[in-house]
């Protein structure tokens, strides 16, 4: 059965992690295409990402969070029923990602120092500011041979590798820490406790014609399902699956 999946952070740090993951996915997808309009999406996502990195001390916080996860995983060693080989492999991956993150320069600094990127970044903050008369440099680049552009895009993405690897590991472990459980919302409303949780994951069948509005924090959260179509009625009961991570 097809389901729509939603995620909701329960603290500001996880909110930032999810936004970074979202932007990196946009960049990765756009970098693999030949369409110049997709390449402009790459730049917009990249500059949004750099804005976030300028506002938060991500490197320190992400390194701390990865180390906390590593300590939790170590407690599973020698526990019956745990795949020790898979666990050791994951611990090795975390050790490597943590080491590379700590050893890395300021996150995104090479991208900030790039002459071409720094020359076009400011115009992307203006609505419609990437037109050819605003950014002739960009439009020259957009018409370079595809191999040249893909090499540039790959280079820029690679300068975020340490952050991306650490972030992906942390989010993977966090998502896998909470299994999906069936739940029922009555009159479109559901609430529950979430002690020490950092992320909610929700699956719902699109045939209900609703989307979730989620509010909450580490201690408690509420979900209200809203009809997508104006004036539509909502089912008395809505079955969905929820993971508290």
UniProtKB/Swiss-Prot annotation:
Sorted UniProt keywords: Cell cycle, Cell division, Cytoplasm, Septation
GO cellular component: cell division site; cytoplasm
Superkingdom: Bacteria
InterPro entries per UniProt: ZapD (IPR009777), ZapD_C (IPR027462), ZapD_sf (IPR036268)
UniProt entry tagged with the keyword Cell cycle: yes
GO biological process: division septum assembly; FtsZ-dependent cytokinesis
Subcellular location: Cytoplasm
This protein's record includes keyword Membrane: no
Complex and partners: Interacts with FtsZ.
Role summary: Cell division factor that enhances FtsZ-ring assembly. Directly interacts with FtsZ and promotes bundling of FtsZ protofilaments, with a reduction in FtsZ GTPase activity.
Family: Belongs to the ZapD family.
Official protein name in the record: Cell division protein ZapD
């Amino acid at each position: 059965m097809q389901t729509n999946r939603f995620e909701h952070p329960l603290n500001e740090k996880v909110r930032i992690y999810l936004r970074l993951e979202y932007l990196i996915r946009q960049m990765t997808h756009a970098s693999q295409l030949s369409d110049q309009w997709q390449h402009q999406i790459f730049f917009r996502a990249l500059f949004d990402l750099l804005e976030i990195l300028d506002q938060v001390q991500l490197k320190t916080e992400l390194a701390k969070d990865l180390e906390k996860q590593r300590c939790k995983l170590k407690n599973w060693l020698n526990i019956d029923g745990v795949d020790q080989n898979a666990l050791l492999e994951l611990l090795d991956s975390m050790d490597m990602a943590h080491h590379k993150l700590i050893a890395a320069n300021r996150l995104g600094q090479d991208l900030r120092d790039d002459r071409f990127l720094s020359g076009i970044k400011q115009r992307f903050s203006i609505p419609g500011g990437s037109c050819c008369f605003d950014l002739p440099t960009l439009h020259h680049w957009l018409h370079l041979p595809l191999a040249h552009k893909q090499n540039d895009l790959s280079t820029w993405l690679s300068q975020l590798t340490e952050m991306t690897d650490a972030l992906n590991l942390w989010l993977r472990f966090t998502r896998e820490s909470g299994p999906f459980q069936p739940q029922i919302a009555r009159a479109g409303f559901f609430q529950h406790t979430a002690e020490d949780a950092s992320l909610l994951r929700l699956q719902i069948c699109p045939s209900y014609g609703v989307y979730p509005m989620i509010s909450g924090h580490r201690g408690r959260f509420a979900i209200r399902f809203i009809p997508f179509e104006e004036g539509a009625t909502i089912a008395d009961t809505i079955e969905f699956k929820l993971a508290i991570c």
